Amino acid sequence: MTDPRSALPNVFTNISAREIDFVTRFTDNWEALREVLGIMRPIRKAPGTKLVSYTASVQLEDGDVPEGAIIPYSKATVVEAAKGDLTIQKYAKAVTIEDVNKYGAAIAVQKTDDAFLNELQSTVLDSFYDFLTDDTSAITATYSTFQMGVAMAIGKVRDKFKRMRKNASSVVVFVNTLDAYEYLGAAELTVQTLFGIDYVKNFMGADTMILSSEIEAGTIIAVPTDNIVLYYIDPGDSEFAQLGLNYAVEGETNLIGFHAEGNYNTAVGASFALMGMSLWAEYADAIAIITVDDTP
């Protein structure tokens, strides 16, 4: 009699195929999210790289200079505003032989791989939210309505980029999920979902509005997409391999490494993920953090 489990889809009998599937899906998801956010391609950095955000300003002198006179220097000021380390994050999960026996490999392995992948994606965005809200150089203000808060958040970062003589080609706005739905309840707008991330396109001047429960209620954050950079460490770095750690990577941009193996001592299927990714804002003072408070 044929084992009915053999007919189930997505059962990887080859560990290498499962590893490649995992890293390919992760990379494809991030590529799609990058396009939604409108940010440029990821930039590879060496392990231990220091990430720095700046504030920048120029005090322009008069350009009407008499013939033969010394041209006065315009004062340019660049100040380091925030620092961070681009570090390696290490994750592991295990599926027991009992779970495979109870549910079958298609559920016990594949479903937990899916959940593992989603959590790894979310941790990068969550860290970015923390970075944005902890920024003491950000533009801050308070408005009485959600609509005004969104509009002014966008306006303030566009104005900042204009005064920096930079082009804010598009702006992404981050808002609390319930705040957005409360406002959107009366509006005919389509909320789209990409790998568990809810967003609205072309809303009130924002090219993309990200809805997240990680953003505090009453808080609106706006960032020009030209101010967002995704840095990463290549998990396939040859120096890691010298430790005997060989992670599967896939594609031109190796954002994550994945390795799966069986552990006979505990009778589990162990999976290991290695990544070093950080979304970063280059100019700390080109971020707007708006508080919505309708208290009279």
Language model features: what each stretch is:
Residues 1-24, 28, 294-296:
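Short, intrinsically disordered N-terminal pre-domain segments
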Residues 2-9, 43-50, 189-296:
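Sequence/fold signature of self-assembling virion shell proteins
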Residues 7, 22-29, 43, 47, ...:
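Generic hydrophobic, helix-prone segments enriched in Leu/Val/Ile
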Residues 18-90:
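Assembly/oligomerization interface modules of large self-assembling protein complexes
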Residues 89-99, 173-179, 205, 211-213, ...:
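Helix N-cap / beta->alpha transition motif
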Residues 89-91, 169, 265-267:
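Residues at beta-strand starts and edge strands
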Residues 92, 96-166, 289-296:
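Alpha-helical scaffold segments that mediate packing/assembly in large oligomeric complexes
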Residues 136-207:
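Extended, solvent-exposed, turn-rich assembly/linker loops in the middle of proteins
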